[in-house]
């Protein structure tokens, strides 16, 4: 039994609140245990220079932690005059994860900006950001579709993310900060609804881990990703992205 009382294969409680802010085309507050992230999706009717005239869209992400999202105050990155390596890595991960879910040709020459602001951090902020941002992305794309229906609906499949790791001798799902801080192995896994992998980030913090342990962790991650996708479906009130558009 873990310190939180959860079983090793149990995720934290998930709450997804849509339309959390007024102005963004997609806006979600996602809470996974004590981790809380505000995710917004904003649409621009233009693309980066390298995509002009291509007929393809683009999705990019920014990630930020509020100063008191952590136990001690974290300095705002704007005051450092640079983005640190961790932040850059995370926002690239979020962008890659969401782009993998979207047909850019079907989207057309538009940019969707994903902004993830961590309000409170207790482990899993990057995976929580991906899971919440996907719901915000669906809401934003559906608003586009309501204004002018797509010939082909751009979002191809559900995407979620979850952390797994080895704490002590136990392989556990959805690590909180207390567990993440002492984990021998820490891994973030991004998956589709069909069980396909988009990204696997794994580190042996206290030494190498075996292929058998890797397979066991990935099996655990698949269970967690499915639960996260079910939370997304519950929030969207649909089992199908097509139903989410109102299309027949």
Curated annotation (Swiss-Prot):
<keyword id="KW-0819">tRNA processing</keyword>
<dbReference type="InterPro" id="IPR020568">
    <property type="entry name" value="Ribosomal_Su5_D2-typ_SF"/>
</dbReference>
<dbReference type="InterPro" id="IPR002381">
    <property type="entry name" value="RNase_PH_bac-type"/>
</dbReference>
<dbReference type="InterPro" id="IPR015847">
    <property type="entry name" value="ExoRNase_PH_dom2"/>
</dbReference>
<dbReference type="GO" id="GO:0006364">
    <property type="term" value="P:rRNA processing"/>
</dbReference>
<comment type="function">
    <text>Phosphorolytic 3'-5' exoribonuclease that plays an important role in tRNA 3'-end maturation. Removes nucleotide residues following the 3'-CCA terminus of tRNAs; can also add nucleotides to the ends of RNA molecules by using nucleoside diphosphates as substrates, but this may not be physiologically important. Probably plays a role in initiation of 16S rRNA degradation (leading to ribosome degradation) during starvation.</text>
</comment>
<feature type="binding site">
    <location>
        <begin position="124"/>
        <end position="126"/>
    </location>
    <ligand>
        <name>phosphate</name>
    </ligand>
</feature>
<dbReference type="InterPro" id="IPR036345">
    <property type="entry name" value="ExoRNase_PH_dom2_sf"/>
</dbReference>
<feature type="binding site">
    <location>
        <position position="86"/>
    </location>
    <ligand>
        <name>phosphate</name>
    </ligand>
</feature>
<comment type="subunit">
    <text>Homohexameric ring arranged as a trimer of dimers.</text>
</comment>
<dbReference type="GO" id="GO:0008033">
    <property type="term" value="P:tRNA processing"/>
</dbReference>
<keyword id="KW-0820">tRNA-binding</keyword>
<dbReference type="GO" id="GO:0000175">
    <property type="term" value="F:3'-5'-RNA exonuclease activity"/>
</dbReference>
<dbReference type="InterPro" id="IPR027408">
    <property type="entry name" value="PNPase/RNase_PH_dom_sf"/>
</dbReference>
<dbReference type="InterPro" id="IPR001247">
    <property type="entry name" value="ExoRNase_PH_dom1"/>
</dbReference>
<dbReference type="GO" id="GO:0009022">
    <property type="term" value="F:tRNA nucleotidyltransferase activity"/>
</dbReference>
<keyword id="KW-0808">Transferase</keyword>
<dbReference type="Pfam" id="PF03725">
    <property type="entry name" value="RNase_PH_C"/>
</dbReference>
<keyword id="KW-0698">rRNA processing</keyword>
<dbReference type="InterPro" id="IPR018336">
    <property type="entry name" value="RNase_PH_CS"/>
</dbReference>
<protein>
    <recommendedName>
        <fullName>Ribonuclease PH</fullName>
        <ecNumber>2.7.7.56</ecNumber>
    </recommendedName>
</protein>
<dbReference type="Pfam" id="PF01138">
    <property type="entry name" value="RNase_PH"/>
</dbReference>
<dbReference type="InterPro" id="IPR050080">
    <property type="entry name" value="RNase_PH"/>
</dbReference>
<keyword id="KW-0694">RNA-binding</keyword>
<dbReference type="GO" id="GO:0016075">
    <property type="term" value="P:rRNA catabolic process"/>
</dbReference>
<comment type="similarity">
    <text>Belongs to the RNase PH family.</text>
</comment>
<dbReference type="GO" id="GO:0000049">
    <property type="term" value="F:tRNA binding"/>
</dbReference>
<keyword id="KW-0548">Nucleotidyltransferase</keyword>
